[in-house]
Amino acid sequence: MLHGTEVLKKGFAKMTKGGVIMDVVNAEQAAIAEDSGAVAVMALEKVPADIRASGGVARMADPNKVQEIMDAVSIPVMAKVRIGHFVEAQVLEALGVDMIDESEVLTPADERFHIDKKKFTVPFVCGARNLGEALRRIDEGAAMIRTKGEPGTGNIVEAVRHMRIMMSEIREIQNKEEEELWEVSRKIEAPLELVRETAKLGKLPVVNFAAGGVATPADAALMMQLGADGVFVGSGIFKSDNPEGYARAIVEATAHYDDPEVIAEVSRGLGTAMRGLEISEIPEEGRMQDRGW
């Protein structure tokens, strides 16, 4: 896959627009994702639900694991690195992954700085809860943004919150005067140039996916109707009773997000979705969405 300039990196991200990107931990799961119509897979050692359950320090996947998944599919392969861990990113770039996720799902490596993504030829995706976080990551070189949600919970409420906040903040700046945009830039700690561009476009200058808590076809369609350009599914597929069925159904629901009849049809007889977590049950220090700044 050709990467390099900012235009090429953003162009690759746009190629996934309207699709579903699935977390996978082995070649078998990667094949299920590809057969279901996923536009890409995310290679990692454990899905977020298992990372949450096992505790400890979560790191980049073993290069052998990433290579195994890359060899198993023809669709693009992404992989996660810890926030601020630019050497993990260098390793993944050397392996030839198609995109890197600087992810709050893994244990942050740097409490002050995110990775300078402009130094890499491979594109990056980063999570955000609001417009300020999104524009700061884009300023660092992110080619794609996704909601953080609360990973590994099967609970869509935080992803909905983050998407609504971001879309509301974008609408608020669209009709502001230049001096007001200066004020917004200072308030959200984001570059004025990106604030201006977002106000003019009426959307982020890069694709904006939903992630964190998507567990059903209806969840995926909900996020698309709220303005997402596509959907990441972490634990929702392979923690369900019927991974193949849920994978296909979520792809269909994402593609036909504005057609309730299609969503109803693909949702029939899927079996039990992953067991979800109530957000209030998660202690503050255990909330992955709060990682990063």
From Swiss-Prot:
It is an enzyme of class 4 (lyase). It catalyses: aldehydo-D-ribose 5-phosphate + D-glyceraldehyde 3-phosphate + L-glutamine = pyridoxal 5'-phosphate + L-glutamate + phosphate + 3 H2O + H(+). It holds the Pfam family SOR_SNZ. The active site is at K80. GO terms for biological process: amino acid metabolic process; pyridoxal phosphate biosynthetic process; pyridoxine biosynthetic process. Pathway: Cofactor biosynthesis; pyridoxal 5'-phosphate biosynthesis. Its EC number is 4.3.3.6. D-glyceraldehyde 3-phosphate binds at R164. One of its GO terms (molecular function) is pyridoxal 5'-phosphate synthase (glutamine hydrolysing) activity. It comes from the Archaea. In the presence of PdxT, forms a dodecamer of heterodimers. NCBIfam families: PRK04180.1 (NF003215), pyridoxal 5'-phosphate synthase lyase subunit PdxS (TIGR00343). HAMAP family: PdxS. Belongs to the PdxS/SNZ family. Catalyzes the formation of pyridoxal 5'-phosphate from ribose 5-phosphate (RBP), glyceraldehyde 3-phosphate (G3P) and ammonia. The ammonia is provided by the PdxT subunit. Can also use ribulose 5-phosphate and dihydroxyacetone phosphate as substrates, resulting from enzyme-catalyzed isomerization of RBP and G3P, respectively. This is Pyridoxal 5'-phosphate synthase subunit PdxS. It comes from Methanothermobacter thermautotrophicus (strain ATCC 29096 / DSM 1053 / JCM 10044 / NBRC 100330 / Delta H). The gene is pdxS.
